[in-house]
Amino acid sequence: FHRPSQAVMAATPALAAELRTRGFGNVVLWSRGVDTSLFHPREIDLCLPQPVFPSVGRLAVEKNLEAFLDLDLPGTKLVVGDGPARMALERKYPDAVFLGARHGEELAEIYAAADIFVFPSKTDTFGLVLLEALASGLPVAAFPVTGPRDVIGASPVGVLNEDLHTACIEALRIPRQACVAFAAGHTWHASARVFVDHALNVRPLGSPGEVAEFVAEGPHVAA
């Protein structure tokens, strides 16, 4: 169905590579974005022991939350989200704080009041919560896997380590402003600009029956 397309957009380099191995041509990157008018640093106090290490997302087995909750960390382990594993996790980890699902301004305030965003999943292909946390000024601690690796790469805004505890502690040394600056280049405006750039690179149809051609111009940088 997609193979005749002039361009196939993929959200991450890993997804783009997977599509190419499956025979898809003209694969181009179109990353996701974050609403920096909502997610940004602000002075909020959750009245919890610090540092605060939040993890945000669906509470399910595939999210690997126990890898985070098993860690012996200073301060508070904060879990935001709901899902089928919530009751079992609350029983097993009474020392962690479970807030349930939060959205919009309420979620943004939780990010802003925290210190290090912990992303224990090894199965996510992107993870918009990573960008939300970074925009709020939170360095990221995660495993070096698809998802965090695609979003953060080699940028000094997080620590990717097979030892998640080490990642959490080392991330405390990362300046929050570096995270905000990184996220500023990944807004929804920037994402839309990349989409438009890709669309403009499709040559218009000539004679009836002619297939439009996609002209690749290398990496696109949204202004």
What is the predicted role of each segment?
Residues 1-42:
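Donor nucleotide-sugar binding/catalytic pocket of nucleotide-sugar-dependent glycosyltransferases
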Residues 9, 45-74, 78:
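Conserved donor-binding/catalytic core segment of Leloir-type glycosyltransferases
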Residues 29, 88-90, 144-161:
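Short acidic/histidine- and often glycine-rich active-site loop of Leloir-type glycosyltransferases
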Residues 87-105:
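Nucleotide-activated donor-binding/catalytic signature segment of Leloir-type glycosyltransferases, i.e.
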Residues 122:
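Aromatic "clamp/platform" in nucleotide-sugar-dependent glycosyltransferases that forms part
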Residues 173-216:
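A charged, aromatic-enriched C-terminal amphipathic alpha-helix characteristic of glycosyltransferases
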Residues 101-102, 109-114, 195:
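Short alpha-helical donor nucleotide-sugar binding micro-motif in glycosyltransferases
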Residues 139-142:
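Short hydrophobic beta-strand element within catalytic cores of glycosyltransferases
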